[in-house]
């Protein structure tokens, strides 16, 4: 499994429905939301087998606007030998 940063932008008008759909698909507790600060975007860190699987955490109505960015964590010892 790989770690992904999920970025799920939506509009003010879509907000309530997006949050409810995120709850319905089981990912609400994975997300942190910028909506109350005027940034209508959900952010999450999840594990998935690939990008397509990671994108399933975003409701279908806005999935095309979302991103799943594969992440790595660098090992300090390996970095010393670069």
Walk through the language-model features, giving the residues of each:
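Conserved, structured core segments of small domains
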Residues: 1-82
